[in-house]
Amino acid sequence: MPIKIFNLITTFIFITSFTQCANQGAPGGGPVDKQPPVVIKTTPNTDSIRVPVNLRDIYIEFSERMEEGSVSKAVFISPPLNYEYKWSRSRKLKLVITDTLLEQQTYVVSIGTEASDEHSNKLESSYQFAFSTGEKIDKGSIAGKVYGIQKNETFNIFAFILSDSGKQDFIKRKPRYISQSGKDGQYSLNFLKADTYRLFAVQDLNNNLLIDADYEKIGIPLKDITINDKQLNFTGLNFRISKVDTVAPYFTGIRPVNNEYLQLRVSEPLILNDKTNLHIIDSLNSDTLKILGRSVNYESDNIIDIFTETMDTSARYQLFSNYIEDSSGNRNITRQKVNFISNLKTDTTGLKLIEFIPADSAKSVYPATPVYLEFSRPVNWKSVENNFNLMNGERDTLTGNWKILSVYDAEFYPGVPFETDSSYTAFLNFGKISDLWGKLFEDSLIHHYFSFISSRELGEVSGKVSADSLLPGPVYLTLKKLSKGQGKNYFRQKLDKPGVYRIEQVPEGQYGLSVYWDLDKNNQYSAGRLFPFSFAEPFSVLADTIKVRKRWETQGVNIKLPVPGGK
């Protein structure tokens, strides 16, 4: 019996030892690999010349094993060549060329930042190397930054040579040169030949190397860049990412919520203005159903809330439009129609004031804060304007302007801005305010007393906006808070032209500064268009963080705008 037990123990030890030997590897619990991979060797070597046009293989060796699928989406050859992938142990990549190279041509091989190792660590920046079938390597370069992308998000940079085609059909053809944005959105295109280029930053979700503007975000440049002996390298061609919409909006459906409220579904967010044409008739007798109010739905920008007179349960309604416009400026002027019948439900929501800001007895309010009102039901804003009163500490009545945000809420801005170290009282005669159907709210007089922060708790930022050329159009600065804390998160200032600025009453904290040139004078940044093509407006983002201290003016915060190209 002891011999059998001994044999069993011996066998167990042997099997355990064998298993441990067979599963050798990195010891568990070691540090996680966070080191980004790098390219350690290429063939041809970078800057090689007189490379034969019948070159068949390009080799790329990485510092560690790569995730092969990610690399296949991140390798580009410019000008484009047809090739196949072959791997050796996931570290050495061979590109098997199936084309004949052009004579006297510099070729650029780019490995973008989407390429990652087996631990999902991406290349820190795009890697490029070049070789030539001729006697020299082209040395032109364009660099810049892509703004508005998410952390770890990558955008492709497409470079088109304008002389490649008589038509600027950027949607239909692939770019001559390609790179990818890297850490913090930085990008560079190297080894460019002398010519004029138009660049785009492209999301390229399907990796087809085409601009699919209908569903991909893109960045349009502010000008074209010419590379020549006088300007071999250009730095500072930056992009702001946006959705360049080219499709006109249209109705997608309608839902009666109750007998006075409709939800009109549209293909994309609309701009509601005086031109927006919506009307409703009963198709049985052509009687008109009056629309009392409309606004964008709180929960979905693709829904328009429409409030009407009480609907007839026997009617067959049709909602018509011959003009709607989306937020990108695309207009639909064709006749559109949706059919619906009344919902029998009745809205029983009580008439209440949901929010009144500043709150009663609020202290240390920031001067840029408007008076904000929000109601439980769609309100007749004319009745609000007639029954609202704002007084300063000397009991003087202050006039101002209402900014209607929706049928439910609005902001009041006094004609003379609120002052620091001062107190105010806002009165609302609630009993004389009515909803869209004329129903009055409960009779009461509401007043809010509030005081503003001391000027000793605020700081200032000043400097100069400059540009090499003066063009007609105002300049808009935005000072945005980066650190957490109380107070307004951003400050906006308009200048008639580039020049000296001063932003006052800024809470203590860290801020970023940006500026754009409103050349089309529409009071917002224009990101450019593909059809018909137009450049983006010039903008600039200050690289340094601004630290604002109370009772202190942060001076000399200067920022320069780039000069745009022509249309």
Annotate the PLM regions.
Residues 1-37, 501, 564-567:
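Bacterial Sec-dependent N-terminal signal peptides
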Residues 2, 6, 10-12, 215, ...:
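Low-complexity, intrinsically disordered short peptide segments enriched in small/polar/basic residues
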Residues 15, 191-194, 508:
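Alpha-helix termination/capping residues and helix-transition junctions
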Residues 428, 436, 464, 469, ...:
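C-terminal soluble interaction/assembly domains
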Residues 21-184, 188-202, 214-218, 243-461, ...:
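Acidic, low-complexity Ser/Thr/Gly/Pro-rich repeat segments typical of extracellular/periplasmic
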